[in-house]
Amino acid sequence: MAYRKLGRTSSQRKAMLRDLTTDLLINESIVTTEARAKEIRKTVEKMITLGKRGDLHARRQAAAFVRNEIASENYDEATDKYTSTTALQKLFSEIAPRYAERNGGYTRILKTEPRRGDAAPMAIIELV
């Protein structure tokens, strides 16, 4: 089997992976269990590779997976308006150009101490 079940149905698992992938793209570092970190590494690597391609088809493929969440919001005093950047825009404009010279290996998993409640192995996954 090429993936972990993570104790969920396929729809729940896909939703969780989409959420965690989007959170990692927005925050660039998240704390999760070790098994989840190893699973979202695959999806994040694919999304960054799509971002590096940068064409319309790659953008649409990434948009089909990444959640439509606001990554940052800035206030422009000149126009008296807020401008927001979505996770997809951040992927294509900030994250992908950063890895233009790197072929894969965009994430790093750091193991941390076990979770207090159930002693699940925890890890920090971050963009390199």
Swiss-Prot record:
It holds the Pfam family Ribosomal_L17. It comes from the Bacteria. InterPro entries: Ribosomal_bL17, Ribosomal_bL17_CS, Ribosomal_bL17_sf. One of its GO terms (molecular function) is structural constituent of ribosome. Transmembrane segments: none annotated. The keyword Iron-sulfur does not apply. GO terms for cellular component: cytosolic large ribosomal subunit. GO terms for biological process: translation. Keywords: Ribonucleoprotein, Ribosomal protein. The keyword Ribosomal protein applies. Belongs to the bacterial ribosomal protein bL17 family. Part of the 50S ribosomal subunit. Contacts protein L32. HAMAP family: Ribosomal_bL17. This is Large ribosomal subunit protein bL17. It comes from Streptococcus pneumoniae serotype 2 (strain D39 / NCTC 7466). The lineage of its organism: Bacteria, Bacillati, Bacillota, Bacilli, Lactobacillales.
